[in-house]
Amino acid sequence: MLLYVCLVNLLLPLSDGAVNPELVGVLVKVGVDAALQQIDEVWKGSTVRDWKCAVENKSNKTLYAMGTTPESGSMTTILDDIPPENTGIFVWEKSRGAATGAAGVVHYKYGNKVLNLMASIPYDWNLYSAWANARLSDDKVSFSDLYYGQNGAKSATKGGNWGEVDGTKFFLTSKSHAEFKVIFSGK
């Protein structure tokens, strides 16, 4: 199986000698599990809350990166386009020093539609749970709409369960360093 890995930036050491998990997007022509394992080998972050996502594009069109809508934290990798039959990877971390989780929406252009992927990893597991959602729509969808299942969005799926919406199958683990697996068929 061909493996295409595009690393635009490597782990950058901070002035105090610690490792800074500033990585680039990784584009891999393998399955979701192999892609997540690949990023584990290069990303050695020490954040309290984060989620890494592998988006497997099983459609016949390229998913064009459109950016993010942060709720808490931000993407720490470059969001790349994902050609058909390829897998794109990115990492989202909580804001450093803040008592918040890691939550936001990633947007990809798919033809004349937008694929919106939402994940939320809580700061306090005693009060909150991990949630994920997806929606293929005409425009970008807000975090709030995806989290609460409003304005046409389906209800979010609790971490530890498979969800399926608009040709998108996804699974978010319920742990502080979560894995968000997304399989997009475009159907």
UniProtKB/Swiss-Prot annotation:
What are the subcellular locations of this protein? Nematocyst; Secreted; Target cell membrane
Pfam families associated with the record: Anemone_cytotox
* A GO biological-process term: monoatomic cation transport
Q: Which InterPro entries match?
A: Actinoporin_PFT (IPR050677), Anemon_actinoporin-like (IPR009104), Cytolysin/lectin (IPR015926)
From what superkingdom does this record's organism come?
A: Eukaryota
Q: Where is this motif: Cell attachment site?
A: 158-160
Which UniProt keywords are listed? Cytolysis, Membrane, Nematocyst, Secreted, Signal, Target cell membrane, Target membrane, Toxin, Transmembrane
Q: Does the keyword Cell membrane apply?
A: no
Single GO MF annotation: toxin activity
Query: Mostly located where?
Result: other
Q: Where is the signal peptide?
A: 1-17
Q: Which GO terms describe its cellular component?
A: extracellular region; nematocyst; other organism cell membrane; pore complex
Give a short account of what the protein does.
Pore-forming protein that forms hydrophilic pores and causes cytolysis. Compared to equinatoxin-2 (AC P61914), it reveals lower cytolysis activity (5-12-fold difference, tested on erythrocytes), a larger pore size (probably 2-3 nm) and different affinity to membrane lipids (100-fold lower affinity to sphingomyelin). Binds to sulfatides. Shows cytolytic activity on HeLa cells, with a different potency than its paralogs (from most potent to less potent: HALT-4>HALT-6~HALT-1>HALT-3>HALT-7>HALT-2).
State the domain notes.
Answer: Composed of a long N-terminal alpha-helix and a core region rich in beta-sheet structures. Before the pore formation, the alpha-helix binds the lipid membrane, partitions into the lipid-water interface and stabilizes the monomeric molecule on the membrane. Finally, it traverses the bilayer, thus forming the transmembrane pore.
The annotated subunit structure for this chain is: Octamer or nonamer in membranes. Monomer in the soluble state. In vitro, interacts with folate receptor alpha (of target organism).
Q: Which family does it belong to?
A: Belongs to the actinoporin family. HALT subfamily.
Q: What is this protein called?
A: Hydra actinoporin-like toxin 7
